């Protein structure tokens, strides 16, 4: 059976603001891929759909620019413009349905499915039903209250209840529908009097058909599911996608070597032995004998800038660009960080786009470290200033300059071209740009130790009033550049 794929994606996404200030809600990235693209690929891969109709409205040009004619994604995309997004989902379905004369699978564009069984939809669904509604087991009752439930009798749907106050059972309805052409003809009849004459709520309209005796059937979906309506829903979607395939992800540890030789080589070897690290990329200005000894070309790779004057930002970007992992961890070669914290970063990266360490938790700082007194207060001041300047993003930081951090490759790709700092300011700059990209950052306490004698030059080189002033200027300039962009 040749199926049409229908993806209504015209809504404004008000509840997801400011994420939807410049893109449609359906184009929000989930693990680096727009959710709408994920649904196009689901239709293509699980149901063999090659003819996809996308209803566009709010920021519709973003969708058209991304998909084009669909050939890049192995489908043919036809766009249906909805000039009246205020008329809600039924009007979008009506506009697209006027040109649909074949069975159609409709997925709501803001729903994310992970590990689903949509491939079984055609074989398992009632072939006589005009509408098949996908159901899935909810993890929490509040999920059901945000969606709908179906009332069954003899295996058929006889009613649909939108956002039930007291749901019974664990099943809830989803935005997966198998629709026969007759449904679109019925919708055309209801809109015969003009755009204002039709239904305003899709679930209520389906419920009226079910109560009138139109044959409808359920289909039991498996896997995990979230309807992306808010920032929290987007975070949940990212977690579900990343957690589903986390064990298959490769992790690269980028270790920035700042002039040391024997000491750095010892630390590189320790990180290479840490569970969860697939490769260590040691990046330095020039080739050093000790690093050459530990670099085996597979587990440990040595990358050099071939420039004795290369600054820290150059080394950082060079190492990250050369790393091959899906997950990128980053540290600096002054032997103050603990390899055992790698596991901590990997746990939190399931929930975040970037995880930044903080050296301000007193219980985890070795006595005698430089993170005390005026140095500690300076780091906290910069972090709190960032919170104030970007307060609407509800960020919480105490140490935005900490080098020890982890992030997804997709996050780095997003911010790469915006990193313009030339020296150690790149570390707070990365935090700023991830925030500006509206990605999620979590700060975690890490172990922090005293520097060995061979690394003491780091203190005099970077922990200066001049460095503080440069970071301060960076924060102010980036915030001023954001004025009017998302308020």
Where are these regions (language model features)?
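Conserved N-terminal catalytic core of the sugar/cofactor nucleotidyltransferase
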Residues: 2-7, 33-106, 279-305
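N-terminal nucleotide-binding beta1-loop-alpha1 segment
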Residues: 1-21, 241-259
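Hydrophobic helical membrane-anchoring modules
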Residues: 214, 219-277, 283-289, 296, ...
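Catalytic-core segments of class I nucleotidyltransferases/pyrophosphorylases
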Residues: 122-123, 153-226, 231-235, 239-240, ...
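Conserved beta-loop-beta/alpha segment of the NTase-like Rossmann-fold superfamily
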Residues: 64, 72-149, 326-363
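Conserved core of the sugar-phosphate nucleotidyltransferase
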Residues: 114-193, 355, 360, 375-385, ...
């Amino acid at each position: 059976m040749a199926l049409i794929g229908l993806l209504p994606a015209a809504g404004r996404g008000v509840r997801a603001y400011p994420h939807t200030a410049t893109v449609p809600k359906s184009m929000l990235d989930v693990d680096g891929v727009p959710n709408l693209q994920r649904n196009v690929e689901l239709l293509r891969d699980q149901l063999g759909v090659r003819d996809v109709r996308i209803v566009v409205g709010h920021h519709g040009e973003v969708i058209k620019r991304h998909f084009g004619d669909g050939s890049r994604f192995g489908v043919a995309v036809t766009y249906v413009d909805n000039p009246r997004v205020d008329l809600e989902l039924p009007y979008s379905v009506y506009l697209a349905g006027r040109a649909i004369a074949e069975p159609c699978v409709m997925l709501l564009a803001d729903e994310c499915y992970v590990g689903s069984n949509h491939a079984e939809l055609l074989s398992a669904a009632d072939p006589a039903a005009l509408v098949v509604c996908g159901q899935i087991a909810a993890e929490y009752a509040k999920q059901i209250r945000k969606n709908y439930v179906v009332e069954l009798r003899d295996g058929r749907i006889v009613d649909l209840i939108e956002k039930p106050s007291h749901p019974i059972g664990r099943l809830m309805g989803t935005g997966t529908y198998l629709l026969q052409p007759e449904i679109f003809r019925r919708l055309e009849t209801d809109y015969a009097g003009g755009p204002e004459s039709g239904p305003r709520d899709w679930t209520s309209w389906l419920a009226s058909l079910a109560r009138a005796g139109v044959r409808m059937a359920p289909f039991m979906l498996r896997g995990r599911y979230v309807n992306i309506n808010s920032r929290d829903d987007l975070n949940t979607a990212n977690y579900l996608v990343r957690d589903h395939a986390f064990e298959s992800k490769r992790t690269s540890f980028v270790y920035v070597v700042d002039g040391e030789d024997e000491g750095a080589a010892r630390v590189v070897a320790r990180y290479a032995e840490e569970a969860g690290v697939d490769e260590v990329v040691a990046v330095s200005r020039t080739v050093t004998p000790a690093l050459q000894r530990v670099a085996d070309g597979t587990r440990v790779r040595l990358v050099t800038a071939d420039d004795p004057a290369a600054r820290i930002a150059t080394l950082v970007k060079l190492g990250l660009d050369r790393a091959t992992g899906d997950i990128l961890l980053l540290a600096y070669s002054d032997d103050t960080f603990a390899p055992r914290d790698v596991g901590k970063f990997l746990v939190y990266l399931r929930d975040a786009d970037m995880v930044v360490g903080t050296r301000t938790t007193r219980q985890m700082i070795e006595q005698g470290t430089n993170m005390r007194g005026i140095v500690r207060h300076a780091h906290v001041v910069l972090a709190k200033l960032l919170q104030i300047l970007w307060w609407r993003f509800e960020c919480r930081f105490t140490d935005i300059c900490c080098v020890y951090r982890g992030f997804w490759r997709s996050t780095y790709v997003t911010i790469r071209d915006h990193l313009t700092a030339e020296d150690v300011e790149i570390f707070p700059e990365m935090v700023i740009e991830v925030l500006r990209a509206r990605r999620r950052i979590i700060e975690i306490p890490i172990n922090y130790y005293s520097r060995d004698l061979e690394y003491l030059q780091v203190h005099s080189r970077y922990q200066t009033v001049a460095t503080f002033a440069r970071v301060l200027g960076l924060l102010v300039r980036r915030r001023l550049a954001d004025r009017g962009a998302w308020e």
